[in-house]
């Protein structure tokens, strides 16, 4: 058992989309990374022989949750608007935990659609969902 104290700092998580650093992260979970493919699957045959297969689907889904006041909403909306017009709106995305060793980078990503919008007395959140091509991804500790 290690006696070393480990530290995570949310203000050391860098989100860069299309070369632009994002800011105005929501309180709580502000980035989620989900593998869309199955990775591996397995089955057992009638005689008990086990076989496994690898999914060729290398896509990931990334969700950035921002406060409604964040100017980064304008950046993501602009990328989506450009893609809607040109159909060529692919951009790189980088997520890096500078207080740890987790890094996610994809050369090609796109915004799926505009997030749902709610307005109230309080500051609301905007959850932007992106899909990426095959990334370089290291999920590690701090």
Feature-to-residue mapping (PLM):
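Short, acidic/charged, Gly/Pro-enriched secondary-structure junctions
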Residues: 76-105
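Solvent-exposed edge beta-strands and adjacent loop segments
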Residues: 2-68, 101, 108-127, 137
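Short, structured patches in soluble enzyme cores that scaffold and shape functional sites
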Residues: 130-134
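Short, conserved turn/kink motifs that form compact alpha/beta structural patches or helix kinks used as
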Residues: 58-60, 64-84
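Short acidic DE-rich linear segments
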Residues: 139-142
């Amino acid at each position: 058992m290690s006696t070393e104290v480990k530290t995570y700092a949310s203000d050391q998580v860098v989100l860069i989309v299309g070369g632009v650093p994002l800011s105005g992260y929501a309180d709580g979970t502000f980035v989620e990374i989900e593998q869309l493919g199955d990775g591996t699957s397995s089955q057992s045959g009638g005689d008990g022989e086990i076989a496994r297969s690898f999914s060729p689907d290398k896509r990931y889904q990334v969700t950035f949750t921002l406060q409604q006041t964040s100017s980064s909403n304008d950046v993501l909306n602009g990328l989506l608007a450009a893609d809607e017009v040109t159909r060529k709106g692919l951009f790189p995305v980088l997520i890096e935990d500078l207080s740890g060793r987790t890094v996610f980078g994809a050369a090609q990503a796109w915004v799926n659609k505009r997030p749902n919008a709610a307005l109230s007395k309080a500051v609301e959140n905007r959850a932007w969902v992106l899909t990426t091509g095959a990334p370089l991804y290291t999920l590690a500790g701090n």
